[in-house]
């Protein structure tokens, strides 16, 4: 896309951390307060969790709010359609020279919807900037009082959803299973089969309302929400 020499807005991806508003960085607050347009994922029920966290740490009065809708379907075509639609919603503001900040849970580079939009808009010539945030699994480790890795110990970040981690569970070193809620019963079976329940720690909704902390899974908690992270030392 040709934009000639006209001024274009910048598309910022801003990590707001896992839930505790005190974990927003100074840079995240500055960028959120400076941008006239704020975008954020919105659920089917109307919740904008990332934006709600940001509101508790930054002054967002008078901003244009732009809800973005993303499908939970595993169908790749539907996912790509949602990404294009979200990019279409952001583009007019950037084209008009307005900066847009997209609030993202955790860190903007880890399982982030921002990156899909960034790829689309950057290819069209729009400037894009990523503002890192505190990753959810770092907050979970702190909540559990555990080290994630030391010395030469490898650290693996694995998706807990979809088809599950499978054989990657047997990789050497520490493992982080992110967004494990939907696959939780199956993951419990895998951990029990390996006799790992006692050493697995889990936090559900870290820093958010309804937070639950389990220093081990030997009691087999019955339910687990979408924002669930399991750590295996």
Residues covered by each model-derived region:
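General beta-strand structural signal in soluble alpha/beta enzymes
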Residues: 40-41, 67, 102-104, 130-133, ...
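Short, well-ordered beta-strand core segments
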Residues: 37-38, 147, 175, 230
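Class I SAM-dependent methyltransferase SAM-binding "motif I" and its flanking Rossmann-like core
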Residues: 106-171, 221
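Class I S-adenosyl-L-methionine
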Residues: 1-21, 26-127, 214, 219-220, ...
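Short gly/pro/ser/thr-enriched loop/turn and capping motifs at secondary-structure boundaries
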Residues: 45-47, 73, 135-138, 208-210
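A contiguous loop/helix-start segment that scaffolds small-molecule binding in enzyme catalytic cores
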Residues: 11, 100, 169-233
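Short, basic, helix/turn surface patches
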Residues: 66-67, 73, 93-94, 152-166, ...
């Amino acid at each position: 896309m040709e934009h000639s020499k006209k001024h274009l807005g910048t598309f910022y991806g801003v990590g707001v951390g896992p839930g505790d508003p005190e974990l927003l960085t100074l840079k995240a607050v500055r960028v959120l307060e400076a941008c006239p347009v704020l975008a954020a994922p919105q659920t089917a029920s109307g919740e904008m969790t990332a934006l709600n966290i940001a509101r508790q740490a930054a002054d967002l009065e008078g901003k244009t709010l732009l809800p973005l809708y993303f499908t939970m379907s595993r169908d790749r075509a539907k996912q790509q359609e949602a990404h294009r639609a979200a990019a279409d919603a952001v583009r007019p503001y950037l084209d008009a020279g307005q900066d847009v900040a997209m609030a993202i849970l955790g860190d903007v580079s880890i399982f982030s919807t921002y990156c899909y939009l960034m790829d689309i808009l950057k290819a069209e010539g729009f400037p894009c900037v990523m503002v890192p945030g505190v990753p959810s699994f770092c907050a979970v480790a702190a909540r559990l009082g555990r080290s994630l890795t030391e010395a030469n110990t490898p650290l693996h970040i694995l998706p807990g959803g979809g088809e599950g981690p499978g054989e990657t569970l047997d990789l050497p070193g520490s493992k982080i299973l992110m967004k494990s809620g939907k696959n939780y019963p199956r993951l419990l079976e895998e951990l029990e089969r390996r006799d790992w329940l006692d050493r697995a720690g889990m936090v559900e909704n870290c820093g958010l309302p309804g937070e639950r902390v389990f220093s081990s899974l030997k009691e087999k908690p019955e339910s687990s929400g979408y924002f669930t992270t399991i750590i295996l030392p």
